[in-house]
């Protein structure tokens, strides 16, 4: 029995970046031997076992054969006779097909180290096209490794385009699409996930609402980049710099979906996009099964971002109404998340990345002033029933007015 560290752990170790998960492949063993050694089986379709102490995954070396459509249409063959090279051959990218033994000796039959050096994401074999999920995985690796200068090999991009053309992406479940998208939101460059999917044609299939933004013009006065799709990528980039929260990053990526359905006769103006976008966000989140926490923030940002951009023009009464609608009295962190998205939107414009965003400070000032109004003092002043809320509203508005006058 031979045990090797494989996949992402070896790749990240060689790149000098933190290793979080370790996966192992076992050559020359049977399932019975693994059970006898105290390992617990976890794989229903594949021979995967958990180590009795570390709980890390150990998989028997295997080969795969395409038998049907989609990422599940595979027949798995495993036996003690399957060689390490055969197991590595079925993997997606050369940089993920390097193994390391207990002495630190590397086994790299497909040139993964060379591609790591050259910063290339390249498929291991032509069997790459058999699994449509790999299109999304490569896009995610492009996002994860973008700061190190990685790019997708031309020939791999061609294979990704052929997978899209084959219609195989339709076999991906909503859960798988969301899983990869969510993982991409946690990478250093989430915009690259969208950009690579756009490049190979997959964005139109898995996230058509975002794809529809490309080629849609905006007023050059406010958006030097003009194209709404390019703006979305820039906003995604800025959101990742401003916040590590996947929820904030998601909301930033989808806040402008309404611009994709503006009638061309109205271009480059998008007066209704804050409202038309709400339906599209709901539709996308339902289809891809996006968690409610992500959907809810995205809807709020979509509806309010134009108002927040105009913070200097908003009346105190309007500000309090916005705070009520967002329910920030009970969820203070929500306002901060929304302001981060708006700041990313503001900075996500060509040449304006470092432009100040005083609107956030003004909104926060107004919020803190409104927050200082205590309901207890209103009750002590003799107000009862519905009159308490009316008086609270009035005092909050006055507090905001005074704070902004003194700003």
Curated annotation (Swiss-Prot):
Domain of life: Bacteria
Residues the record lists as binding Mg(2+): 21, 23
E.C. code: 2.7.7.72, 3.1.3.-, 3.1.4.-
SUPFAM superfamilies reported for this sequence: Nucleotidyltransferase, Poly A polymerase C-terminal region-like
Residues reported in the UniProt entry to bind CTP: 8, 11, 91, 137, 140
Bound cofactor: record note: Magnesium is required for nucleotidyltransferase activity.
Entry text on domains: Comprises two domains: an N-terminal domain containing the nucleotidyltransferase activity and a C-terminal HD domain associated with both phosphodiesterase and phosphatase activities.
Extra remark beyond the main annotation: A single active site specifically recognizes both ATP and CTP and is responsible for their addition.
Protein name, as recorded: Multifunctional CCA protein
Organism, as annotated: Vibrio vulnificus (strain CMCP6)
Gene: cca
């Amino acid at each position: 029995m031979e045990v090797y560290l494989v996949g992402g752990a070896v790749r990240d170790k060689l790149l000098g970046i933190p290793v979080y998960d370790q996966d192992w492949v076992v050559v020359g063993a049977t399932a019975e031997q693994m059970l006898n050694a105290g390992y617990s089986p976890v794989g229903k379709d594949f021979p995967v076992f958990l180590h009795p102490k570390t709980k890390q995954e150990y998989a028997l070396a295997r080969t795969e054969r395409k038998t049907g459509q989609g990422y599940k249409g595979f027949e798995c063959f495993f036996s003690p006779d399957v060689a390490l090279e055969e197991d590595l051959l079925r993997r997606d990218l050369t940089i993920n097909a390097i193994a390391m033994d207990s002495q630190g000796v590397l086994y790299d039959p497909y040139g993964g180290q060379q591609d790591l050096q050259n910063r290339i994401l390249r498929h291991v074999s032509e069997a790459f096209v058999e699994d449509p999920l790999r299109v999304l995985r490569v896009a995610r690796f492009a996002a994860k490794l973008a700061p190190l200068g990685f790019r997708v090999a031309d020939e791999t991009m061609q294979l990704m385009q052929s997978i899209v053309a084959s219609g195989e992406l339709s076999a991906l479940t909503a859960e798988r699409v969301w899983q990869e998208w969510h993982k991409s939101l946690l990478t250093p460059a989430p915009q690259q996930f969208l950009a690579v999917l756009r490049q190979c044609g997959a964005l139109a299939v898995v996230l058509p609402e975002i794809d529809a933004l490309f080629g849609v013009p905006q007023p050059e006065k406010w958006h030097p980049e003009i194209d709404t799709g390019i703006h979305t990528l820039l906003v995604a980039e800025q959101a990742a710099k401003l916040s590590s929260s996947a929820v904030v990053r998601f909301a930033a990526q989808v806040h402008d979906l309404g611009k994709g359905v503006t009638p061309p006769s109205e271009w480059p103006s998008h007066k209704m996009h804050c409202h038309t976008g709400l339906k599209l966000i709901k539709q996308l989140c339902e289809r891809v099964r996006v968690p409610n926490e992500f959907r809810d923030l995205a809807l709020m940002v979509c509806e309010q971002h134009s108002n927040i951009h105009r913070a200097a023009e908003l009346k105190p009464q309007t500000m309090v109404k916005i705070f009520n609608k967002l329910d920030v009295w009970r969820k203070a962190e929500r306002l901060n998340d929304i302001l981060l998205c708006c700041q990313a939107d503001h900075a996500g414009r060509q040449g304006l990345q470092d432009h100040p965003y005083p609107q956030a400070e003004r909104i926060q000032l107004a919020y803190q002033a409104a927050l200082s109004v205590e309901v207890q003092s209103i009750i002590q002043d003799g107000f009862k029933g519905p009159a308490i809320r009316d008086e609270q509203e009035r005092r909050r508005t006055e507090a905001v007015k005074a704070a902004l006058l003194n700003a």
